[in-house]
Amino acid sequence: MRLILLGAPGAGKGTQANFIKEKFGIPQISTGDMLRAAVKAGTPLGLEAKRFMDAGELVTDELIINLVKERLQQPDCANGYLFDGFPRTIPQAEAMKQAGVPIDYVLEIDVPFDEIILRMSGRRSHAASGRTYHVKFNPPKVEGVDDMTGEPLIQRDDDKEETVKKRLEVYEAQTKPLIEYYNTWAKNGDSSTPLTAPQYRRISGLGSVDEIRDRAFEALK
């Protein structure tokens, strides 16, 4: 099972990624984790990445793809792998294809933006303990106050409505085009690569966590 998980921030990809990893016995490939591990290990690619990072520059797509290829050689990828958060852009997707990274499924978790804004902007947390609440779905017993300590709850900057909207705008511009890219490849194939086209699946990300999990498993049969 070689899989790319797509969906907007707040669509619940992380939660579903955990279910998929467990069911199929595959690792989740995180480019951030890979970069940190390569830099720490001092591998040639890691040293190259460190030069970019120390200069405050973005690591090039070419270097990230080489790190991905190196990571996929590890024994835990023998049964497949799951990409969540990569590729983010069409050039990255194209580079993956040209590098011969095989993908069986692209699974999109589809949630309307107004629902995502409601989900994320309603989160509240207790800073000291990390306990989280939601003003609509999981409210504290007393509004704005932690159940255990009676201390005030905060809204993280990441969860403020204007921040959520900005993140969704970036997603709309950079990552959403991947949906059309993979959909087109799945439907029409691509003679420029020997890779088999992936199957494209879209599921609704509305409902309970278990309902969405069942939809995901059904889509990946």
Curated annotation (Swiss-Prot):
Origin organism lineage: Bacteria, Pseudomonadati, Pseudomonadota, Betaproteobacteria, Burkholderiales
Positions of region (NMP): 30-59
Location of region: LID: 122-159
Location, primary (coarse class): cytoplasm
Presence of keyword ATP-binding: yes
Stated name of the protein: Adenylate kinase
Catalysed reactions, as listed in the record: AMP + ATP = 2 ADP
Pathway: Purine metabolism; AMP biosynthesis via salvage pathway; AMP from ADP: step 1/1
Domain of life from the UniProt record: Bacteria
Quaternary assembly: Monomer.
